[in-house]
Amino acid sequence: MQKRTGGCLCGAVRFEVKGDPEMLHACHCRNCQLMTGSAFAICLYFPEQDITITSGDLTTFVRSCDSGRTIDIHFCQTCGSTLVWEPAVLEGKRGLAGGNFDETDWIEDLNNIWCQSKHNWLEITKDPKNKQQGYSSEDFM
């Protein structure tokens, strides 16, 4: 089984993950824009038991999403890098920030969610997997 590693900007927090993500996307919601300081967040979701924080401590911030649901955001206490997401709607799964992996050339075939909130200057290739808002329950059946 593939193992991948990553960490925060200052190196205090390190993680290891087993396997491939079950879900991956670029989220263009306003909260992800503000959280990352960028146009979107790259989110890779794994079963929570496949993710191990190997060093460092995380601080948690709970926020409301554009959908109205809550999400726990875990970040480095020292440098503030966002590393892990825990959306209430995805029980048993955790999201890892794509930019925090040591190697990123394996990340591909992203779809886009919350496209209705994307910046006007950002072009997104039309794809039926892209969502104007977030996922619906039908996407998980």
Q: Model-derived features: where do they sit?
A:
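A short Gly-Trp-Pro
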Residues: 1-141
